Amino acid sequence: MKAFMGDDFLLDSKTAVKLYREYAENMPIIDYHCHLSPKEIYENKTFATITEAWLYGDHYKWRIMRANGIEERCITGNASDEEKFFAWAKTVPMAIGNPLYSWTHLELQRWFGIYDVLNEKTAAATWKKTNELLQGDGFGARDLILKSNVKVICTTDDPADALTYHELLKESDFPVQVLPGFRPDKGLDISSPGFADWVRSLESASGIAVTTYQSYLDALESRVRLFHNAGGRVSDHALDQMVYAETTEEEAARIFAAGLSGEHVSFEDEKKFKTRTLQYLCGLYAELDWAMQFHINALRNTNTNKFSSLGPDTGYDSINDERIAKPLARLLNSAEKKRQLPKTILYSLNPNDNYIIASMINSFQDGKTPGKIQFGTAWWFNDTKDGMLQQMKALSNMGLFSRFIGMLTDSRSFLSYPRHEYFRRLVCTLIGGWAEQGEAPYDMELLGKIVEGICYRNAEEYFRF
C-alpha cells in the first residue's frame, strides 16, 4: 500500500517515477489561460486568512460544500472566514474521489508543509498554521508565482479593459511576464440586454465612434492591436453553443444595428452575427500570429433562482450536450479557405466531444507549425485524473501527443499551481506505462524529451511570448 499523497503519488511505475523526477518536476510553467487578477499581482496582494486565499471565488469548492449540506451563509454569505474554513474542513473528508481532495492536500503540502489529512479534527491546527504563514513574508501573490517557477501568465481580459496593471507590471522588476488575454464574449452576445452598453464601453476604450457594424469591427481591431502591443498573443472565446451560419456583410450590419438599438435579435440572426464576427477576428489573429482558444459546450446559470440571488460564476454551471462537429468544422474551414486560420486551441466541456476534436484538428494542420491546431487540455469538470487521461489518450490515438502544449490553471487562486504537478505526474504515468508495457521503447532521452515538451517546451515554442 502506498503512503497517502506520498512522493510517488499518481506515479504507478519505476519508469513514471524516473520521468517525473528527471524531466517533469522542475520544468517551468507557462500558464497561458487563467483568471488571476493583474491588479493583485502588481500589488503583490497578501491574504489575511487561508479562507481568503483558498475559498473566495472558488466555485469548485462551493459546489461540493452545498452538496455536503453546508448552508450558503458559510459559502458565499456573511459567516466569518473561520466559520467558512471549518465548513470546508468538514466537507473535505466527504470529497474522497474528487480531485479537490487531492488538490487540497497537495496545496497544503507544497505551500504550508502540512502533511496531515484535513478534517474537523485537524482544522484548528491547520487554520492556525496556514494563517501564520500567510501573514508572514513570502506569501504575497508575486511570491507564490515565483515559488511556482512560473515564467508567463496570460490573464483573461475584456476588450474594453485598460490594461493598466499589465503595463505597470511590464515596467516593474517582476521577472514573470503577465500578459493580457483577449476575451470578447460580451461583444459577440448580441442578444444580451447588456450588449448596447458594452458597445458604448468599447467605444470609450477605443476612441472610435461605433455607429455601424464596420466601425464596431474597427473598434475591436484597435483593441486587438493594443493588446498585441502589450504583449498579448492569445484570445479566448466562450462558445457555449457552437454555431455557424453564413451571412453577408450587409446582413451582419442589419443585425448589428438591431442589437445596438435594443431590438429583439433572433437566434438565427445571432448565429449569423457571431459567425461573421468570428471570421473577421480569425483573420486578424492569423495576421498577428495569435493563438485563438474556443471553450465549447458549457451550460451556464442552470439554476435561475441562484443566478438571481448570487450572480454568475458561483457554481451553477454544468456540461452541455450540443452537437459541435459540423458548425466547428465549417467555421475552421471558412477561415482556412481564406488562408486566415490562426493557431487554434479547442476545448469542450463535454467529454463525448473528445474524439470529435481529436480527429478534427488534423484536418486543419498546415504542415509548417507543429501542432498548429491543438486539442486543449481537459477543462473544468474534466479537470480530473480520469478526464485528463481520457483527453490525453484521445489525442494520442488520433494525433501527436508529443506536440501537446499541456496544462493551464484556468484558476482564480494563486495557490492553484500544484495542479501543474498533478497533471505532470499523470503525463509521466501515461508515457511510463507505454514503456513498461513495451508499447514504447525504454529510451529515456526520447521519452524525457516528450515529457519536457508537454510540460513546458511545446508551449514555449507555440506561443513565442
Question: What residue spans do the PLM features occupy?
Answer:
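Metal-cofactor-binding active-site regions of metalloenzymes
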Residues: 1-288, 340-342, 346-351, 358, ...
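Residue-level detector of anion-binding/catalytic polar loops
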Residues: 291
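Catalytic core of soluble alpha/beta enzymes
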Residues: 243-258, 276, 294-356
